Amino acid sequence: MSEPQNGRGALFAGGLAAILASACCLGPLVLIALGFSGAWIGNLTVLEPYRPIFIGAALVALFFAWRRIVRPTAACKPGEVCAIPQVRTTYKLIFWFVAVLVLVALGFPYVMPFFY
């Protein structure tokens, strides 16, 4: 029997895609801020050509997560996870947290020149 769809996978995919989209820019700054150094940090720029693909994947995953989480409770059968109010509230909070992280990650390359 398959597990019911609850939007958790789409949230994870959106967050992962956002991290990958900003890895070329945010990664080196975070590593330098943590005290790491070395020429290998420059190798993260190899991900730059794939940034539009990662951005698209993040936005598509967030759209599907939003569609699954914000759907009406009437679409849920009684006893399913999506019918429990506390779980719905938790998923909505996690969704908005991930959405803000995605926006920060997507906007970071435009703010990055102020730090270097």
Swiss-Prot record:
**What are the transmembrane regions?**
16-36, 46-66, 94-114
Quote the subcellular location field of this record.
Cell inner membrane
UniProt xrefs under InterPro entries: Transprt_MerT
Q: Where does Hg(2+) bind?
A: C24, C25, C76, C82
Q: Name one GO cellular component term.
A: plasma membrane
UniProt keyword annotations, A-Z: Cell inner membrane, Cell membrane, Membrane, Mercuric resistance, Mercury, Metal-binding, Plasmid, Transmembrane, Transmembrane helix, Transport
Supply one GO molecular-function term.
metal ion binding
The topology of this chain with respect to the membrane is: Multi-pass membrane protein
Known role: Involved in mercury resistance. Probably transfers a mercuric ion from the periplasmic Hg(2+)-binding protein MerP to the cytoplasmic mercuric reductase MerA.
Family per similarity comment: Belongs to the MerT family.
Protein name in the entry: Mercuric transport protein MerT
